[in-house]
Amino acid sequence: MNVIRKLLTAVSLWACLSCIQAKAQTTTLFSDNFQSGSYSTWTMSGTGYDAVNTYLGNVSMRLNGLRQGTKALSSQGYTNVSLSMDMGALYLVQGDYCYAEYSTNGGTSWNTLVLVGDGEDSGALKRGTVSTGLDNNANLRVRFRSYTLYGHYCYGDNVVLTGMPATDGIYDPLSGNGNVSRSALTASFLTGSSTLNLMNFSHYALPSGAANPANTFQGRLTLYGEATSGSATEVGGNNNLPYYSQAQHLPEFEFDFVQNGTHFIPVTRGKIAGTHPSWTYILEPGRVWNENGDSGYSRVAFPFALQERGSDCMWNGVMTFLFKDDGSVSDLAYQIASETCYYLKVNFWGRLDAAYTPATISGAATIRNSYEAEVSRRMPTKPLSALATDYPGSGVTVANIGSDVTAAHMSIYGVAYNGVHYAGGCQTRYGTYPFCEVLDVPSYSTAKSVHGGYGLMRLEQKYAGTQRTLGIDDWVSECTGTQWDAPTFEQALDMATGNYTSAGTTTDEASQAMADGFFKVGTHAQKAGFACSYPYKTTPGTKFVYHTTDTYLLGRAMGQYYKSQAGSGADFFNDVMVDEIYRPLGLSPTSHVSSRTQDTAAQPFAGYGLVYVRDDVVKLGEFLNKAQGKIQGTQTLDAVMVTATLSLGSGGLQAGSAADRYNNGFWYYDLKQDTHNYGCSTAKWVPYMSGYGGISVVLLPNGMVYYQFSDNGQLTWGKSAIELNKIAAMCP
């Protein structure tokens, strides 16, 4: 063998690789010059012999007979891909050949890159290079092959695969090459029959080495065995799970999805009613990628939530499976290990048979474009810890923010300030939730501020005259009693109709009669019948008694009034709340669906029944606190009501202690009366939205919006306010 020639070739290759690495956009995806003295990662086959050949310090793969060494490679996520291979030979005779070959289809067919025959067997290496047809391919193969008599040798050496990360033509491209070390949810597991156990959510997450997907999903995903498979275990001592029918089983699953680059988008967003007696689905966008160990399949992981039917409790999880363009699909694995629910904490997990039916989805391009717009409109996000680095002189102790709530019961929390969303939370019983940006949280009674408060403020702004003083009985036909002659829309919003059973602030709300007569019934006639049945006790507008029923009646009244203006087919929630507020604000499609009565009335609950992702929460808070009810400079909410909400003064009604009030669907707390000295010389009433179990969205007077969604009955946020006051004073 011509050793000098070979060594010069190796030096030249090293110099070439040094140049390649100096180019910022070029990456070496694979290289092997066998200088390690091993080719153990190659697959050897055929008759004949192979050996490590070492001569004067240089190493190569030596083959003779009918022998070949094969290596699987991937260029997934890369363009401008180039492959080079060297082949040399000694002692060939006529009919002997040595091949360096590559395949673009997983080895089904092969292309010759270098061919060495008799007369070219001086030992010098012959190089072949190809730079076309190799881009974005997870199924590349290379091989060295001998077709010789025994003792006639082929020498394979210096395999180099390079490429440039794909940045164009694919939405949100990945930079990995598919080299992922996976110990759970492997391809063999998902295509096998082993039992699934609960595990850290990192196994469901997009890994750092993930490559762009080689397959594209568009069509229907159907699951089988939902009614008989699956596990659910209650966490804690409430022992409420036995009261839920078919609790361990998922609802039936048959939904369409569209892929956009590395993102996996459900066609149907927001809560999906279904027929399961206990749970409804919410599907969120996930990710698609390739891993070299998945045998040409692409891998999907997407978040989903189960919501309690007729109520707001929410459990968040992830589903994952493998698929190919031809409809091949693995089993689907799923896991839930966190919730926002005060009385029922559950882990769900299981594996189900799946089917993928490729199909052209109507409006797929619109779905993709809308999704890209949705993502682009999210407020820029930083981890909560960045508050300390962004405001280094403040002395803020970030660990104290959110500390009013026991960490194990916190779903999400964060702060919006100066155009940045500082986000925390997303911890589960099994690690960090991998899709925090679309973790679904229930509104509970924050809907009273949003649907009730913003809804009436919009109605007041939208039409001439005064709508907030309209009578409830004029627009809710079920309220026929004389006790409803006087209460107005705004008094229902204030929960000050004067109609109640007990004068205690929350006694009626917490009663069994309320649970049985309102929360557990499904039709508008039942809900309205109960809501209208409270007797007269005092003059409307003079006493606060917490009644979700009042907000329900307000929602019905606003809806009926809107129909009188816009036509019998009009829908206040869809037409006004979604089209005139949510969409212009850039809220997620998840927020565009409200819980409704299960009848032809389809009446939105108004006082609860909304779903948010964290970006929705900060936008809804800033809509009032920062934009004062304006969208892109246009007054969308009534300015008078906005001012009365943000600057309470002597308004509102006492709602508990002297430091608590309620007005226009918002709670208020007076910082002047707090045990911490904020330096307020006069009363400083802070409006906030509040929800059952531990939900607060606080419109702080320093321009911040603080939120926390938790489920341990801890509603206070004072420790967070103290820290945020260090960054910007509440009472300057």
PLM-predicted stretches and their roles:
Residues 322, 392-435, 696-697, 705-707:
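A short, well-structured edge-of-sheet supersecondary motif
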Residues 525-535, 539-544, 562-568, 591-700, ...:
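Penicillin-binding protein/beta-lactamase superfamily catalytic region
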Residues 108-135:
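Extracellular carbohydrate recognition and processing domains
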Residues 95, 147-163:
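Extracellular carbohydrate recognition
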Residues 26-66:
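Extracellular glycan-recognition surfaces and repeat-rich motifs
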Residues 388-413, 480-587, 612-618, 622-626:
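Active-site-adjacent helix/loop patches that line small-molecule binding or acyl-intermediate pockets
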Residues 180-202, 461-500, 533-536, 563-607, ...:
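Active-site helix/loop module of the DD-peptidase/beta-lactamase fold
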Residues 442-468, 492, 554-558, 617-624:
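Active-site SXXK
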